Amino acid sequence: MMNFLRRAVSSSKRSELIRIISVATATSGILYASTNPDARTRVSLAIPESVRESLSLLPWQISPGLIHRPEQSLFGNFVFSSRVSPKSEAPINDEKGVSVEASDSSSKPSNGYLGRDTIANAAARIGPAVVNLSVPQGFHGISMGKSIGSGTIIDADGTILTCAHVVVDFQNIRHSSKGRVDVTLQDGRTFEGVVVNADLQSDIALVKIKSKTPLPTAKLGFSSKLRPGDWVIAVGCPLSLQNTVTAGIVSCVDRKSSDLGLGGKHREYLQTDCSINAGNSGGPLVNLDGEVIGVNIMKVLAADGLGFSVPIDSVSKIIEHFKKSGRVIRPWIGLKMVELNNLIVAQLKERDPMFPDVERGVLVPTVIPGSPADRAGFKPGDVVVRFDGKPVIEIMDDRVGKRMQVVVERSNKERVTLEVIPEEANPDM
């Protein structure tokens, strides 16, 4: 190992340096490397402690920070930078332009490397803004316990993002609750909050608290940037255990409600394997930057590692509806729809050879009499292939009262374009 490292210092060729260190670490450590277009190569090398001690004997000008502190990691992190560039950068030791520098990257994901403190740092960023919610329950004035959940403070005015089922009585109140919500912060402060908006269909609600002192807030990220396999953390108060952090990965970025056997409206969730339990509802799903990318909503009771969250991009649209109209306005055209894929299309064509020759789309099995779709000329069996110029129907778009063109395929390869004007959906439908 030491001979390899000495050769690395005397090497002026970037490719040779990478080869030397790669071979040296094959049985002695862990290597990460990346090359960018400006001819800089950065190699991060994790070296066992036994070898680390010997490195201090090499004839290098080693700064005190180069030897990694044992309490930070089981392995020390060394970053070697080979600079093959005409820039006037002063090398540390030799005449060939090769230098050795230190970098403490244990807390940052570098080139796919999850540092020791990465999750802890993300949890520390979001933690102060995560709250415990407690809603007294009763029947005709008789106390019947409390509903427990979690939430996230998203602005300095004291707006808390949570789930509707945590703060709304689904049996007796359909749209919103003006009842009391007890809010407890991570630092122990308690407040009395009020539900200001709730949307039962998406299961998203906003609670408001007032504070004379500054409140911690969380930053909202973008769920559209997520990929299956990305690391995420769930923070909340499962079983009233405040400040609980669990970690996992994104299993699916667009799990459909129909896949979960949930009837009614079309919805999509983020699926993760983070541990989510009773009391986690309403708490944030967070990326490694400490940004909220989802609202934890439910888990599958019959299995472990199947948790679901409302994507923050959808939540942001709901919040905009709340600000603009005080409620979520959804278009309704009066169609029962079934989303098609290749498998379903193949099965339908086996039953009926005249079924439209499409790869994807939305099947219309039912048209509600007297609805906008009925007036526009939709028929049962139509397959919607384009909706207002787009290949899919975007459920959350505010299109009420706007004339739209819908392209449908019918039997015998018939294609027609229909015009429909959506009405506002009844929230109780």
Curated annotation (Swiss-Prot):
Broadest EC class? hydrolase
Top-rank taxon of the source lineage equals: Eukaryota
Q: Which CDD domains match?
A: cpPDZ_AtDEGP14-like (cd23085)
Gene3D superfamilies reported for this sequence:
2.30.42.10, 2.40.10.120
GO terms classed as biological process: proteolysis
Looking at the record, which segments are called Disordered? 87-113
PROSITE patterns assigned? PDZ (PS50106)
Where are the catalytic residues?
Answer: 165, 203, 281
Outline the extent of the PDZ domain. Answer: 318-424
Keywords recorded for this protein, A-Z: Hydrolase, Protease, Serine protease
Q: Which GO terms describe its molecular function?
A: serine-type endopeptidase activity
Q: Where is this region: Serine protease?
A: 113-338
UniProt keyword Cytoplasm present: no
| EC numbers, comma separated | 3.4.21.-
Matching InterPro entries, A to Z?
PDZ, PDZ_6, PDZ_sf, Peptidase_S1_PA, Peptidase_S1C
Would you identify the family this protein belongs to, as annotated? Belongs to the peptidase S1C family.
- So what does this one do? Putative serine protease.
Q: What is this protein called?
A: Putative protease Do-like 14
Q: Which organism is it from?
A: Arabidopsis thaliana (Mouse-ear cress)
